[in-house]
Amino acid sequence: MSRKVLFVATVLRMHVLVFHLPYMRWFQEQGYEVHLCCANDTPDPHPQVPYCDRWVELPFSRSPFSAANREVFRRLKQLIDAEDYALIHCNTPVGGLLGRLAARAARKRGTRVVYTAHGFHFFTGAPLKNWLLYYPAERLLSRWTDLLITINGEDYARAKRFAAGRVALVSGVGVDLARFRGPVDRAAVRAGLGIGPEDAVLITVGEHSERKNHETVIAAAAPIEGAHVLFCGVGDRQAALEKQARELDMEDRVHFLGFRKDIPALLAASDVFVFPSLQEGLPVAQMEAMAAGLPCVVSDVRGNNDLIAPGEGGFLRAPRDVSGFTQDIARLLADPALRARMGERNRREMRRYSLEAVLAQMTALYRGLLDGREP
């Protein structure tokens, strides 16, 4: 086999640049040539991708039913058949679908195929249509998977019943804890946002989408006098969220900050992390908040509840339990000692999810596949 590896994912900015650079760098350090296939979701028509020797831009669609994906599959298979990769690591549902189908012939020639499930679309409480569509597909695709990586307990238990060569549970994608250790001038960060040093500040990070359920954050904060809410992210539901804030007379307390590169500073300037999402895999946003020492009030869904338990690091509520979220947020805001105690617990917990810890897990798995042995 050649000393080449291929990473496959749907998009560059929102996936590859966030999750995969440390692993691409590791392969380069081991002497491998690193190739990448994904769509360009950046504003730059010719972005520079670190630790990448060859980037093949393919217009992946997130919808598995999109006609555009037929051409993506053709070009992806053509590339895989031509390059003789030692290992192909597929990510995202569509990347995992097309990548594994395109690599079937390559597997017969010795290429190892890895798929990371960043959160199956079928899960406890998922709509029936998700189970009817995604469960059979993932079960079938596991036949052409040498290593299926899961990142939460529920997915791991389910995937062990599939036909993949091996199923592993790793601690997410890794959090760079060093980013959350530096000193931050809380007052200065707050002043830049028009928020006073003694005001209560709630923060959430993520795309403005139906899945993130940001409406619950605004509704839960509304009864808490003087509480500010920071939204870090972009998305097509922002206009609806702005309308909700106006209707609740909260437009001066809800701050839409857009896509931010200073998340560690914003977390350090906040008091409570609030995250009522409907579906997660193992949320980086929550892990980063925990690394920053924040207590968390989050929805009791897969992934979120892998990271905290009730009263341990925060509180869990049903995703749309607005009054429950309000109650838990108010309790934390009224008790600085409780916030500090839970925040310190979360800092300690994140050592298991550090970039160093996960990189060690992943490289052991990679080595095991490439050396032809069980890691």
Language-model region placement:
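A short helix/loop element that forms part of the nucleotide-sugar donor recognition site in Leloir-type
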Residues: R75, R181-I195, L338
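A conserved mid-protein helix/loop that constitutes part of the nucleotide-sugar donor-binding site
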Residues: L17-P22, A200-P223, D236-E242, S323
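Donor nucleotide-sugar binding/catalytic pocket of nucleotide-sugar-dependent glycosyltransferases
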Residues: V56-E57, R139-R186
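Conserved acidic donor-binding segment of nucleotide-sugar-dependent glycosyltransferases
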Residues: A309-G311, F315-V322, R331-P336
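Short hydrophobic beta-strand element within catalytic cores of glycosyltransferases
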Residues: P295-V298, I308
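N-terminal strand-loop element at the rim of the active site
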Residues: L6-A68, E154-K160
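A short, well-ordered alpha-helix in the C-terminal region of glycosyltransferases
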Residues: G324, R331, L338-R352, Q361-A364, ...
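Aromatic "clamp/platform" in nucleotide-sugar-dependent glycosyltransferases that forms part
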Residues: F259, L278
